């Protein structure tokens, strides 16, 4: 008996909602939000939300030289300084752009490396 009564109540509620105006429905939503402490905001897609969380929690980065720019010699010098490689190896890294210069670098160090390379004229991305 209780199941039948509950079903009738739900059907009545739905029928009332169908006949309500937009303003009445808006007031209903606000009242429900206040009463139950919830929000009617649409949830963000789970995949996008997970990607945002992964990006926020990332604590190590790969520094990638995407382009040497016009000042190639200056960029080679900075790459040598950062990697400790010789002139030939540093030139090969710069000529082979896009290429990863350093992997698994802490966020602060990655930003520092990026700033040095950009100051020398290179384009850099952190991954």
Swiss-Prot record:
Keyword ATP-binding: no
Alphabetized CDD domains for the sequence: Ribosomal_L7_L12
This protein's record includes keyword Ribonucleoprotein: yes
Gene Ontology cellular-component annotations: cytosolic large ribosomal subunit
Pfam family, any one: Ribosomal_L12_N
Gene3D superfamilies per UniProt: 3.30.1390.10, Single helix bin
InterPro entries documented for this protein: Ribosomal_bL12, Ribosomal_bL12_C, Ribosomal_bL12_C/ClpS-like, Ribosomal_bL12_oligo, Ribosomal_bL12_oligo_N_sf
Gene Ontology MF term list: mRNA binding; structural constituent of ribosome
GO biological process: translation
Keywords, sorted A to Z: Ribonucleoprotein, Ribosomal protein
Similarity annotation: Belongs to the bacterial ribosomal protein bL12 family.
Subunit: Homodimer. Part of the ribosomal stalk of the 50S ribosomal subunit. Forms a multimeric L10(L12)X complex, where L10 forms an elongated spine to which 2 to 4 L12 dimers bind in a sequential fashion. Binds GTP-bound translation factors.
Role this protein plays: Forms part of the ribosomal stalk which helps the ribosome interact with GTP-bound translation factors. Is thus essential for accurate translation.
NCBIfam families tied to this protein: L12
Name of the protein described by the UniProt record: Large ribosomal subunit protein bL12
Source organism: Streptococcus thermophilus (strain ATCC BAA-250 / LMG 18311)
């Amino acid at each position: 008996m209780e199941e039948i009564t509950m079903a009738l109540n739900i059907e009545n509620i739905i029928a009332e909602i169908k006949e309500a105006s937009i303003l009445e429905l808006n007031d209903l939503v606000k009242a429900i939000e206040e009463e139950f402490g919830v929000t009617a905001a649409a949830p963000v897609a789970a995949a996008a939300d997970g990607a945002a969380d992964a990006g926020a929690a990332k604590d190590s980065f790969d520094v990638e030289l995407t382009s040497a720019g016009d000042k190639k010699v200056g960029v080679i010098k900075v790459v040598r300084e950062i990697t400790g490689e010789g002139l030939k190896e540093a030139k090969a890294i710069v000529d082979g752009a896009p290429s990863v210069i350093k992997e698994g670098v802490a966020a602060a160090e990655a930003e520092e490396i990026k700033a040095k390379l950009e100051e020398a004229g290179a384009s850099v991305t952190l991954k």
